[in-house]
Amino acid sequence: MEMVNAEAKQSVPLLTPYKMGRFNLSHRVVLAPLTRQKSYGSVPQPHAILYYSQRTSPGGFLIAEATGVSDTAQGYPDTPGIWTKEHVEAWKPIVDAVHAKGGIFFCQIWHVGRVSNRGFQPRRQAPISCTGKPIMPQMRANGIDEARFTPPRRLSIEEIPGIVNDFRLAARNAMEAGFDGVEIHGAHGYLIDQFMKDKVNDRTDEYGGSLQNRCKFALEVVDAVAKEIGPDRVGIRLSPFADYMESGDTNPEALGLYMVESLNKYGILYCHMIEPRMKTVGEIAACSHTLMPMREAFKGTFISAGGFTREDGNEAVAKGRTDLVAYGRWFLANPDLPKRFQLDAPLNKYNRSTFYTSDPVVGYTDYPSLESTA
């Protein structure tokens, strides 16, 4: 039986080992960063210990949910932070649980920028961004409530180094909490993406206009974080093709290529990119673009995400289109996803209505593993 299993494992590209810098991964199935809104008052909670440890396998790579770098970084209820001592202490047992099962765990550090409103901001001030352009109200994931956004305040040039420093300190705090590294959130219409995308960034100073100027803030964050904790512990997530939160770009391929070529200069560990087919939330669209030019240009580990199944994840690895594949919704609903992929076992269906509820169990830690259903 062991021999059969060993052979089966070898024939599944996603289940082959991979050396990511200093980290020896036993397979290529990555837990994507998933906002779950269960960190009450921005503090990670004990129920996250079980959630993350359920999704840990020996040599598996997990990316924690988006985690705010400062008190201006928040834009959703009960998302975690890492800017205070209390946050750091609350993360420690969660990180320890992942390490106890042999996992590698990175913290995704995040600033929402204009995707916020006064209610989430200190002293009810306006959210900050590269621009003063507001976002239109959006339907929440539950399809009932409407999210409203306060028009942002454009950051002055003098304020930008302070935001870069918030990312640096968040990375330092993540290391103090025991994380193996950090992923800089540069995707999905949040602050770093707002600076990069020409449909948002309307600045006329050194942080706006040309592609190089629009990417300046992102690369300053990368530089500061890499210098603080070492480039071999730093990744970044990018979505040049996506148009989330009214953050599109007129030439996404040029943006993606410029960014990966620039990232090579810093020697960071990985680049995590969203597939062009995931232009909007949760919808797979027909698309002629591919990530191959970025994949070929980037010298570190390449991670792809965006609507992958077992089949096309295996194909992407087998054909060299990516090194690792990040799974979100399927990993949320299948805590033992790598094992299910190995056995080609049926998958639990995910329940979208419980993605963002505050319940500490339902739709969070109650999805069964294969062992619990055997």
UniProtKB/Swiss-Prot annotation:
Residues where substrate binds: H185, R277
EC number: 1.3.1.42, 1.3.1.-
Pathway field: Lipid metabolism; oxylipin biosynthesis
Residues that hold FMN according to the record: P33, L34, T35, A66, Q108, R237, A305, G306, G307, G328, R329
Pfam families named in the record: Oxidored_FMN
Reaction(s) catalysed (UniProt annotation): (1S,2S)-OPC-8 + NADP(+) = (9S,13S,15Z)-12-oxophyto-10,15-dienoate + NADPH + H(+); a 4,5-didehydrojasmonate + NADPH + H(+) = a jasmonate + NADP(+)
N-acetylmethionine sites (modified residues): M1
Domain of life: Eukaryota
Enzyme class: oxidoreductase
InterPro entries with a match to the protein in the record: Aldolase_TIM, OxRdtase_FMN_N, Oye-like
Location in or out of the cell: Cytoplasm
Position of the signal peptide: none
Induction field: By wounding, locally and systemically, by cold and heat stresses, and by UV-C. Seems to not be influenced by UV-A and UV-B. Induced by the chloroacetanilide herbicides acetochlor and metolachlor, and the explosives 2,4,6-trinitrotoluene (TNT) and hexahydro-1,3,5-trinitro-1,3,5-triazine (RDX).
Catalytic residue list: Y190
The UniProt record lists the keyword Cytoplasm: yes
Molecular function via GO: 12-oxophytodienoate reductase activity; FMN binding
Biological process annotations from GO: jasmonic acid biosynthetic process; oxylipin biosynthetic process; response to wounding
Task of the protein: Specifically cleaves olefinic bonds in alpha,beta-unsaturated carbonyls and may be involved in detoxification or modification of these reactive compounds. May be involved in the biosynthesis or metabolism of oxylipin signaling molecules. In vitro, reduces 9R,13R-12-oxophytodienoic acid (9R,13R-OPDA) to 9R,13R-OPC-8:0, but only poorly 9S,13S-OPDA, the natural precursor of jasmonic acid (JA). Can detoxify the explosive 2,4,6-trinitrotoluene (TNT) in vitro and in vivo by catalyzing its nitroreduction to form hydroxylamino-dinitrotoluene (HADNT).
Similarity comment text for this entry: Belongs to the NADH:flavin oxidoreductase/NADH oxidase family.
The protein, known as: 12-oxophytodienoate reductase 2
Organism: Arabidopsis thaliana
Encoding gene (name): OPR2
